Amino acid sequence: MYAQKFQVDVWIRGERQSCPLEWLDQFCMRNFTNAAEFDDTLPVSDGCVEASFRLTPERFAEGLGAWLTQRGKGEGEPVRVEARRT
């Protein structure tokens, strides 16, 4: 069902880490994002998401970064997200 896999890393206060599965789960649920483009996503593990071809890694990173920053996950700083196809 899912056509591609993304490796998702977050940068918080200059430190890189795999995005926690809990954050990916919450973000990919439509009632949190209210965006249909994230409907066809499946968080698999820390730092790993499967997605349809409707979604680009760049758009996923942009949306997740804004969402994490809005929720204060960056400890007062913007959260930078990198997503790439694996």
Residue ranges and their predicted role:
Residues M1-T86:
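Charge-rich, low-complexity N-terminal segments
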